[in-house]
Amino acid sequence: MSITPERKTALVKEYALKDGDTGSPEVQVAILTERIANLTEHFKTHVKDNHSRRGLLKLVSQRRQLLDYVKGRDEPRYKALIERLGIRR
């Protein structure tokens, strides 16, 4: 199941650094985290769905790259972000 447009808008408002900010790493990581959570729930009932599992691995990799970027630029911002999202890292 994908994210509804309303949920995506709420995530953008919550994690945006300023109005209209949809491209900051914080917003992108928040949206990816939501999609990863949805796919994780999907796999609890559809264990053999390997095509979607590949998509999940791509999303996790993309999120990790963005988090590494934030960590390299501003470590306190990185720590605050993973704390807010509840990511175990």
Curated annotation (Swiss-Prot):
Source organism superkingdom: Bacteria
UniProt keyword annotations, A-Z: Ribonucleoprotein, Ribosomal protein, RNA-binding, rRNA-binding
Xref: PROSITE patterns: RIBOSOMAL_S15 (PS00362)
A GO MF term: structural constituent of ribosome
Pfam families: Ribosomal_S15 (PF00312)
GO biological-process terms attached to the record: translation
Cystines in this chain: none
CDD domains on file: Ribosomal_S15p_S13e
SUPFAM superfamilies: S15/NS1 RNA-binding domain
Single GO cellular component term: cytosolic small ribosomal subunit
Free-text function comment from the UniProt entry: One of the primary rRNA binding proteins, it binds directly to 16S rRNA where it helps nucleate assembly of the platform of the 30S subunit by binding and bridging several RNA helices of the 16S rRNA.
Subunit structure comment from the entry: Part of the 30S ribosomal subunit. Forms a bridge to the 50S subunit in the 70S ribosome, contacting the 23S rRNA.
Family to which this protein belongs: Belongs to the universal ribosomal protein uS15 family.
Protein name: Small ribosomal subunit protein uS15
Source organism: Beijerinckia indica subsp. indica (strain ATCC 9039 / DSM 1715 / NCIMB 8712)
